[in-house]
Amino acid sequence: EHLLELAEKGNKPFTESLNPGVEHVLGIRVPDLRKLAACIARTDWERFLETSDTFYMEERMLYGMVLGCIRPDEDLEVYLHRVTCFVWMINSWSVCDTFKFAGGQRFVDRHAGRLWEYLKQWMNADGEYEVRFGVVMSMSYFVDEAHLEELLACYDSIRHEGYYVKMAVAWALSVCFVKFPERTMEYLKNNSLDTFTYNKILQKIVESCRVDKDTKTLIRSMKRP
């Protein structure tokens, strides 16, 4: 009922246009869902996770948002099991990309080794949104000095044909370029990416406001036919 009330002040046609082919979209604004998730996290959130439905896209999104608002379980594996249950229900890029780990960067730093291995497993999964989850989350938390080389290798090894996987890899590698331009440039000159993904990376780099004009000119010249 609460979701249906929020849907009344949302924009269903716009949300559907952003998520083509996804059924049962209510069109609720993301900030409204985040507020609701924060409220649920302060109450009986475990009961919510156990009884939550997945009919509407926004119900799936809300499930992930609640996982990002709660205090993570003392046992990391219990929390990751909850996250895994969420990943299995992802049915759109927007459900995937609105997720954040509970506890923020401090939580990630404290459990970096296990979380890194966890995300690598998703990058090797079969499902389109499972792989996207691994790519987007690794981009969000692990584009750093310690993980860059392995991260580039992971992205380069992905062979999934899903559109939303390719777009995620392109996005992630453009972020790598902004943060580590020289080392990512070396990678761009010698990689095994398909042409669509490779050219999308270049496009995203050119569109970035954090890349200078001369570099953008060079990047444009690297496009594959």
For each predicted feature, which ranges?
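Alpha-helical scaffold domains
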Residues: E1-P225
